[in-house]
């Protein structure tokens, strides 16, 4: 195969390859319920891709924009490639679903259609229908006086073709809308689930009395869900955002998912009203709401079909019986979630809320959980009279409503709530707490790569950095002043902030390694690499002989393996039990060489968001980051390597070498570390860690 010499890979096609790697997990030797989770994740990812990315390409095409980007693909080129790719991959999705369904049946867990149920389970399905479904579904007739209804984004329904009992020649069309509050897979026994559309279809004639069902087809619509808000024209951003959320429900239709082998007249009926381009219609022989598979994966009777549970560990120097402030007074601390517990982060905020010496708490909130103990602690602190400043990013996509709720609750408690800076999203993860003791101010700071969300911290890999170092006091204060006030000098000292500094600083460090040529070394771990300036700089470094390892979970627009250009760049993507979310950067000849950040290397992060990049100076903490990166580079079980063609190949275990699954390795490492600590409570953590590393 000839070498592709364009250094840029199309962003959308790269994303499709990432989602294919998610689907690929279903083929691996992992527990069956975990495979169901990956099916659900794949479908949820695809929903968002169509709602945002495909919808955006359609808008560009409709507007007549034909200019291509660095990858030389026009909007129409991309739409054609996306549709062809997904129509082909649909077959693979169906095959994996049926394969997993059969394997589950062999283990005694069943997914059955209504007509496959025995008499006892049919009766239970009927009871569920009449008591739980019938009262809240909406039967809709469509005729000259009752127009086709409005369908919200991701609405799920059953289209029906009916005839009157006393008039066999009559044909009527309608639908049965299935509420979001209803399960997509109904549990009729501990070991049996039924797609809800199968139950509703069986009872269509009870829903339309006096009519006979000729045929039915489950379907689901996807709308353009991108919200465009003119912030500069908004007097009250909260009101404008609430209006924008309503408009999301009315965006243009961009996709139709429908049951395979549907009655042609039903398809014609839907097409006449939805007017979705035929290549954006996907016909499925499997349930079209696989996001509902999460309902099955939580079945505790089949816990043996899931991964063994792992409990994140709280390790020294943290101690549940010791104040977190006194712990932070002694040293800087870096922990790696989810192997290490998120509890110290929550404990920091809770202690601050209760400590009478704390006078100020400032933090950024991007994606928080619905019942957030962190936000509740902030509310308690504000109610107690402490100065609380919360930057609540209302523009966090698909978390807007939850963030609106918390913003209002914080305001009612008396906190100063900031909604962001006009034209920018605030994506930085930072907390600053100030204590006043004996007339002196003491700063306690937390900087991280992940959200302040205890739920996601159990499944996302992220880094948390706790510090009282004076070098960060002024920077953290200035950052929050930038958020709350007027400040044109948006530059920090030790910390770097986008949009003014991070990209510039990264390019400087890449250039420094470039000057060292073959002695240079770069390792960068992130979620996505899209920014063209970063791609060009990395290729220039590679051409100079710098060895570069990129660990990019999702989109990567850099094409490796071009002779004389990017041949010294290796790109891997790790997909497994945990979602890789940490951003860690290493530059051999920089001082310090290690950084953590909230920012991916994308134009939106580097140019249109407020992000932070934090230098790590402590040698022991640098060593911890180094070990994380080394382990990921060596992974030969979860890693996929990006090839020059733009395709990804699974990294295989070399002959004579051991399998390295970095998720399993770290679980085992931290389990063993924790057990040893429990046995030797008086030993210092570094001594135990050294001993364990030697043993391993």
From Swiss-Prot:
Top-level EC class: transferase
Reactions catalysed according to its record: [phosphate](n) + ATP = [phosphate](n+1) + ADP
Binding-site list for ATP: 45, 460, 553, 581
Signal peptide: none
Cofactors (names): Mg(2+)
UniProt-listed GO biological process terms: polyphosphate biosynthetic process
Function according to Swiss-Prot or TrEMBL: Catalyzes the reversible transfer of the terminal phosphate of ATP to form a long-chain polyphosphate (polyP).
Name of protein: Polyphosphate kinase
Species of provenance: Campylobacter hominis (strain ATCC BAA-381 / DSM 21671 / CCUG 45161 / LMG 19568 / NCTC 13146 / CH001A)
């Amino acid at each position: 195969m000839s070498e592709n010499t364009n250094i840029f890979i199309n962003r959308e096609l790269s994303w499709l390859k990432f989602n294919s790697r998610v689907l690929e997990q279903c083929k691996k030797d992992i527990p069956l319920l975990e495979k169901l989770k990956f099916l659900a994740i794949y479908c949820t990812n695809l929903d968002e891709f169509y709602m945002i990315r495909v919808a955006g390409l359609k808008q560009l095409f409709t507007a007549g924009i034909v200019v291509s980007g660095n990858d030389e693909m026009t909007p129409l080129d991309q739409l054609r490639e996306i549709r062809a790719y997904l129509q082909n991959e649909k077959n693979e999705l169906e095959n994996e679903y049926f394969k997993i369904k059969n394997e589950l049946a062999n283990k005694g867990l069943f997914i059955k259609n209504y007509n496959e149920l025995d008499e006892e389970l049919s009766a239970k399905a009927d009871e569920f229908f009449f008591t739980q479904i019938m009262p809240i579904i909406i039967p809709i007739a469509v005729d000259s006086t009752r127009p086709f209804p409005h369908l919200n984004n991701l609405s799920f329904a059953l289209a029906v073709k009916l005839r009157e009992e006393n008039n066999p020649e009559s044909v009527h069309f309608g639908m049965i809308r299935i509420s979001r509050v209803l399960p997509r897979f109904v549990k009729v026994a501990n070991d049996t689930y039924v797609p809800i559309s199968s139950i509703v279809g069986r009872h269509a004639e009870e829903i339309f009395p006096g009519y006979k069902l000729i045929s039915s087809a489950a379907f689901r619509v996807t709308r353009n869900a991108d919200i465009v808000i003119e912030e500069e024209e908004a007097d009250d951003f909260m009101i404008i955002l609430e209006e924008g959320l309503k408009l999301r429900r009315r965006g243009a239709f961009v996709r139709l998912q429908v049951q395979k082998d549907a009655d042609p007249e039903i398809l014609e009926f839907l097409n006449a009203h939805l007017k979705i381009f035929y290549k954006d219609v996907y016909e499925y022989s499997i349930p079209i709401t696989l996001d509902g598979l999460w309902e099955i994966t939580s079945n505790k009777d089949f816990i043996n079909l899931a991964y063994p549970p792992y409990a994140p560990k709280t390790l020294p120097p943290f101690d549940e019986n010791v104040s977190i402030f006194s712990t932070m007074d002694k040293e800087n601390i870096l922990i790696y979630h989810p192997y290490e517990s998120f509890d110290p982060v929550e404990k920091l905020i809770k202690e601050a809320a209760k400590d009478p010496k704390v006078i100020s708490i400032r933090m950024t909130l991007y994606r928080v959980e619905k019942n957030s103990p962190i936000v509740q602690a902030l509310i308690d602190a504000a109610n107690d009279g402490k100065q609380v400043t919360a930057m609540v990013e209302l523009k966090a996509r698909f978390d807007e409503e939850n963030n609106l709720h918390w913003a209002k609750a914080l305001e009612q408690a008396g906190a100063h709530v900031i909604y962001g800076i006009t034209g920018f999203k605030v994506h930085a993860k930072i907390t600053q707490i100030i204590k006043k003791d004996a007339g002196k101010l003491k700063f306690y700071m937390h900087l991280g790569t992940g959200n302040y969300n205890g739920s996601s911290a159990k499944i996302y890999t992220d880094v948390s950095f706790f510090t009282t170092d004076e070098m960060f006091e002024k920077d953290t204060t200035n950052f929050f002043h930038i958020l709350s006030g007027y400040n044109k000098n948006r530059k920090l000292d030790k910390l770097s902030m986008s949009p003014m500094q991070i990209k510039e600083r990264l390019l400087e460090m890449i250039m420094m390694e470039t000057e060292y040529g073959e002695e240079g070394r770069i390792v960068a771990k992130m979620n996505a690499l899209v920014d063209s300036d970063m791609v060009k700089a990395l290729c220039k470094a590679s051409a100079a002989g710098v060895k570069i390892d990129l660990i990019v979970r999702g989109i990567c627009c850099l094409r490796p393996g071009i002779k004389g250009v990017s041949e010294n760049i290796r790109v891997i993507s790790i997909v497994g039990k945990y979602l890789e979310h940490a951003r860690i950067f290493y530059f051999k000849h920089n001082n310090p060489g290690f950084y953590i950040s909230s920012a991916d290397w994308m134009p939106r992060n580097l140019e249109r968001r407020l992000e932070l990049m934090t230098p790590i100076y402590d040698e022991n903490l640098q060593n911890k980051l180094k070990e994380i990166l080394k382990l990921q580079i060596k992974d030969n079980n979860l890693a996929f390597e990006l090839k020059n063609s733009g395709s990804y190949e699974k990294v295989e275990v070399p002959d004579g070498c051991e399998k390295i699954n970095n998720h399993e390795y770290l679980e085992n490492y931290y389990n063993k570390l924790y057990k040893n600590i429990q046995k030797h409570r008086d030993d210092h953590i570094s001594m135990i860690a050294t001993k364990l590393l030697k043993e391993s």
